[in-house]
Amino acid sequence: MNEQLHNRTMAFAGILQAIAQVQHLARHGESDTDELAASLNTILVTNPESAADVYQDKAALHKGYQLVLNQLGDSSQKDVEITRYLVGILALERKLTRSNSGLAMLAERINQVNRQLHHFAITDEQVIANLASIYSDIISNLGPKIQISGNPLCLQRPIVQHKIRALLLAAMRSAVLWRQLGGKRRHLVFARKAIIDTAKKSLTL
């Protein structure tokens, strides 16, 4: 298996895994604690030696690979809403990587969260609120806001809002890694078959 393509597909799966949780939270107001932790933990791995260092929860990653097959494959599983969120995240990532001040602020704020984890779990409400505020303060202001659709009763709850923003930050982290590994939007069209084949092979590992 082409290692660069494997790593790039892993990062793309990470984006989709976080976005799918945003969609579920917005509709149902609930999240799977293990999946949430898996996505949020990716934010904190800022100097990985490999993509695998970022995605250590293999069960969560497998869900991401399945989403890659659903979104890029020819099946009826394609989800237009997830595609819309993906396009929004990739657009914001382009703006972030062009903003030196934004990247510096992001690094400093993530360091603060790492210090907070000496006392709290990654899924503690205080940590999630902190991650959400990083997204609001740094990412949201970069460009058009991503409009989240869902159940208004769920979306009104502060904890749901915080989790959604924290997961969008996780999606952004994976998008940054995907781009660093050579990912480009045109690959999602012209290299679709190679990405699908890599995701299928990765599901069997």
From Swiss-Prot:
The keyword Cell inner membrane applies. The keyword Cell inner membrane applies. It is a peripheral membrane protein. It is found in: Cytoplasm; Cell inner membrane. Its main location: cytoplasm. Gene3D superfamilies: HflD-like. Belongs to the HflD family. This is High frequency lysogenization protein HflD homolog.
